Amino acid sequence: MRAVARTFLLLVALLAVAGAAPFVPDFLPAETSDRTAWRQELIRLETHLASAYANFQWTVETDSLDLVALHRAADSALATAPNRHAARRAFRELVDAFEDGHLHVDPPAHPFIRLAERAVRGSGGPIEAGTSAGSACRRLGFSAESHGFGLPFDDLPGYAPMATAPFRAGILRGVNEDIAVIRIASFGEQNFGAVCEEAWRAREAVSGEPCDESCADALYEDVSRRLVATFARTLEQLERSGARTLVVDVTGNGGGSGLADALARELSPVPLRSAPVGLIRHPHSLKALAGQESLLTRELARTDLPDRHRALLDSAHARVTETIRQLESPCDVTPLWRGERVECRQLVSDGMVSTGILSYAGPGELEDLAVAPSLFHPLSYAYREGVYTGKLYVVMDRASASATELFAALLHDNGAATLVGERSWGAGCGYTNGGVQLALPSVAMTLRAPDCARLRLTGENERAGLLPDIPLEWEEQDRAGKARMAIAAAATTARASRASSPKRPSR
């Protein structure tokens, strides 16, 4: 018993050193004052959802979510909750009813988990020169995840590998035609630990200085550059192989960052125009756009600004200013919690687009403008348009989400790709500048709500999920069968498309 007691005291001491908050058991019996606080917190949460959750009004109107019944159930559960554990469950059930993967309410990480994470990632200070690449990248938050195919295309007869990590690719040799396949397992740079290690070793070869915050940012950008360049080189290999059809496997890809936008543009010879994004009428959106307006004003004040850019920046400034004006016009949708109708729209969706202010700009087109990445976010990546020029098929499933949906919708809605498989997850847009969080101290939870809604060129909200052009009725556990069906669908459709296309006259 003494050994157990000593171990417990040691853990408490370690947690204190780690700065952990005091641990309060969730199963202590609730007092009346606790239940009152929980019910008041519920009202705060509902008000916050109505003001700061971008898909709130859309979900109520599209999914016919009964907010009156939802509130009644949560309030009743909190009024009788025996302890904080039960109260947390009531909050979680209310939030889960919106079925939005980006909307969640969570308790803080357990102190033991935070302690373990700190042990793995270190204190968070500068990383000393000479640190091994693996240790440095773990400290920076990178992980070495598998980048194998989501569906086993590499097990199909006739498969010839051409590339492995970070983008596995190969050719399926067929009787009628060869089909190229490539895997994108993630659009999050932090999931490419091996690429980070390459970047770290390259840095170590030329610098003997510790890696501080600015160094970490530069390393992250280097990882992005390496990924975009590697993807382009892999596409060039596939193009040279003679395969006129490419299948892109994004099954199980839960999303990531703007990397999705850059890679999509390398896959299409067609200029891809971005769709609108809906912003919440909230100080969070206004703060972000005020920063944009300030940048544009500063750039327009340049005496050396090229004439060809001044009209573009004037137009961009006018669009931002008008969007700010609309965001400042209030729209209270909290009456929806009472079952009442509202006539205004929660979002402003006719100003900004998913790439910023401009729906399209060519690579290098704005290179002499400091604000270029603000005007068109993909310009922060050194991508090349149209590296691959053949027929394109994107294979997705119900686990394809978030940035993966941006990737697929961008290609599909511009007529550059055919979607194959299942309806995607329907996660849509996530967070800009961290999103809008709400602390719920009485239950020690934090709500995180998406602050943007990504629309498609058709006007649909990506939260509805993307429907495939070629839906496949496949057995959930039959992964090999899924791969065969996807290839067969792509091959059949590609042949039919070529047969119906007018032949070029011979010279």
Model-derived features with residue positions:
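Flexible, low-complexity junctional segments that flank or bridge functional domains
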Residues: A13-E343, S359-A361, L366-V371, Y388-V394, ...
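N-terminal Sec-pathway targeting helices
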Residues: M1-L15
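Feature marks proteins synthesized as precursors that undergo proteolytic processing into two chains
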Residues: F376, S380-Y381, G459-L466
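Ligand/substrate-recognition segments at binding pockets and active sites
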Residues: A401
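Glycine-/acidic-rich phosphate or pyrophosphate-binding loops and their flanking alpha/beta elements
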Residues: V371-V387
